[in-house]
Amino acid sequence: MRLEVDGAPLDVTPQPGQVLRTLLREHGVTSVKKGCDAGDCGACTVLVDQVPVHSCITPAHRLDGSTVTTAAGLGTPEHPHPVQRAFAEAPGFQCGFCTAGFVVTASTLTEDDLADRHRKLKGNLCRCTGYRAIEDALDGVVNTTCAAPGAAIGTSVAAPAARRIVSGSEEYTLDVPDGLLSGSDDGLRRTQALLHLAVLGSPHPHARIRSIDTVAAEALPGVHAVLTYRDDPGVLFSTGRHESRLDDPDDTRVLDRVLRFRGQRVAAVVADSVRIAEQACALVHVDYEVLDSVHDPDAARRPGAPLLHGDKTTAEHRIGEPARNVVASLHGGTGDVETALSASAATVDGVWTTGRVSHAALETHATRGWVDPDGRLVLRTATQVPFLVRDEIARVFSLDPAGVRVVAKRVGGGFGGKQELLTEDLVTLAVLRTGRTVQFEFSRRDEFTVAPTRHPMRVRVRLGADADGTLTALHVDQTMDTGAYGNHGIGVMFHSVSESVAVYRCPVKRVDAESVYTNNLPSGAFRGYGLGQVVFAIESAMDDLARELGIDPVELRRRNVVVPGDPLVVTDPHEQSDLRWEGSYGLDQCLDLVEDALAGPLPEVPRMDGPELSGPGLDHAADWAFGTGMALAAIATMPPRGHHAHTSVELLPGGRYRIGVGTAEFGNGTTTVHTQLVATALGTTPDRVDVHQSDTDAARHDTGAFGSAGVVVAGRALYAAAQALRDDLTARALALVAARTPRTASGVLGPAVVVEPEGVRVGAELVGHAELLAEGPLIAHASHDGTPRSLAFTVHGARVAVHRPTGEVRVLQSVQAVDAGTVLNPEQLRGQVEGGAAQAIGSTLYEEVLLDATGRVTTDAFRSYRVPKISDVPRTQVLFADTHDPLGPLGAKSMSEAPYNPVAPAVANAVRDAIGIRPYRLPMTRDRVWALLADATDGGGA
């Protein structure tokens, strides 16, 4: 059959049952993305005869004679469609993976449609932005501008990739047809014909493989290899990645004979197509010895419980207590908490629980691997940590790290989920076995059922205070379900009780925390890295304490938060820390800003699906109860134990600069800020700075993009390299001028020297780039280890309405004040805060990965796992404290993870204010809030 695709004819023969999305991508149309393959997210939206459709559920065989238009067909980076230009200038994206679909849908909207945008765009999801920037794009609002030479800091510069993203031409992980082309900026030739990998998952939560028969699978035409535990390289590792691999337990194998959660790999098939590989998986015959399983962390620690890793040891594998299923624990404090509580004028004691949350990044985990002509293993993969992936792959497979290259193109969302090694190891095993190019791509179901989630926690908080509100005792007792494996199970536990506890002054503190193995799917790194769960509990308890004492919640916090000079104590007041008060302090400003915002008029009530807010005024709307809440959070500007970045800046012919940096870009915005920092130091504009990034060939080392370290670590290193290059430029220019300029009698030559876009001006003379480079290359290197660290602060405020008949909670006002130091790019930072708040609202009100009693995930699609839509999220008002942090680049702090943490308790405190009942469990779904109201009505209380 024949189609017209983006103005060109395409003669194709679809496979039986094939959908339009896969057909287009097979023919090199990579602007069409895979987000769900179920018609839920809109990333694959195209126009068929000018009507927007989800190509992932559109049967290809029905389209003979049709005209198909993708984002690439609407316009190009050089000549964008008006809607594409609007999305670039708003900017209506962060990671950008959803943007092509949004642009295609938006291109069809009339003025009347724009007035009904929440309904018209309900089929398009964005995980990053919080939707305000997308609405700005729809309204033609321009939030970006160009920077003057040397003056990019503080300017809302557009992302370097903006025009490519909106036109669908920016490359993501699998946006290559059969391989990488010769002459591409990767320097790689076209690879061999592509093989695909599919996995057979365990049907049991705990089992041992007695035997496995792969004969029938191997006999299927098109199958090249069937991999089982017999092919495992025999090296234990952790999928969680950190600068020091010793931060995580060695408890995982590429393919294990013992299976510890439903869906764990039993076998992997490498075949000519995904379809053949999946068919072969069904032909693998396995005899399982089913073992007892345990799914509750309390039961897992009881004597006689099934042991998940009882064959491992603390000394060798870094597991705290294998005989108790405990990965790690922390027990300690300052003083006697029981005595302090008994002597307090007021006390609070409560237990808060949080559920599993999916990262729900629209680009799923994916890796393509091959061996290049030089014999190096190359992995093109969706990761936040390319260098850490390289090093662990080399260790597990006994390879020289110099013989492994890891490349991450733009990544379609991370949020911590791509700080894992989930696909790269199997692809490596398959490439080494077959010698061919192999691709492994998670389905959306895999993302829900196999990929790690946020750690569910149970947190008991006990607080004591004097009558004037001064804290006298703080006890946190935290239990964390890390699932079947300990990836991040140590780090998240320790981090969750660090800044959340240290932010308050209190003479007596105690922390009891344990991270526990269960036969549930693994948990992992997630935005906030455990702080969000514990902050929810502590800030809720602080709100209850304020009510107990009759003190305003903001005032209670003012009386108890740390101020410069205070020790930052968790359990040991004498512990040495690299956290420094030399950094800025803006928590006091943030409290004031949110307090003032909540005292002001209510913003326009957002239009949302569901019952109308009716009545003559909101305060009298029938069936609705209204409340106000706030919460605060602190977070260190980067992770502890070191975070390293090595960078370079080089002058190119024509006055352009090229930076080499290992940091991945996945919507975190570091690429934009990196160009701003370098342009400012070198007296040029960001558009003249080229970026070679997230490639293990781009720099000597980079720990990766996690812990909000992209600006404060790699950014600081890049700025130092740019300053060093500036000094080299001026020195060379002075030498050139001095060689042809007679010296004065005194021998002093002291004209003004300025680095400009066209060269270096020495007095009145301009030394151009060509002359500078004629003397040899000009390149500078610098590194930074991320120490010392300072603290960033966020305060969130919320006003909510609770619908008593149904339990629905609507956020009417969302405001967050942030202490981010110097704001390098205001629009980009605003977007990070809005996106973090929107993600947190989702996990506060409805997002939860649910498991049945046997560990089976029951929310395995976007239709059962609700991600906020454009109609769900209020606009978050973002306020900046006026601070300057001398520890960060040009005074900046990190601010990617911080906005997430205070949102849940702020909303929960507002719900408590509205209905008079304390919610203790996240998410606060309609059913749960309704049950609270029903119990109170029936006399059951909260």
Question: What is each of the regions a protein language model found here?
Answer:
Residues 139-318:
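Flexible, low-hydrophobicity surface segments
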Residues 91, 161, 241-249, 318-367, ...:
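Glycine-rich loop/linker segments at domain edges
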Residues 308-397, 563-656, 858-872, 877-879:
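Helix-loop-helix junctions that connect adjacent transmembrane helices in secondary transporters/permeases
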Residues 410, 414-435, 439-441, 670-677:
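Thiamine diphosphate
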Residues 230, 398-403, 433-438, 467, ...:
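C-terminal catalytic domains of large/alpha subunits in multi-subunit enzymes
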Residues 197, 282-289, 295, 384-387, ...:
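Extended active-site and interfacial segments that coordinate phosphate-rich ligands
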Residues 1-152, 167:
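Signature of N-terminal electron-transfer/Fe-S-associated modules in redox systems
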Residues 46, 170, 174, 366-371, ...:
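Short beta-strand elements
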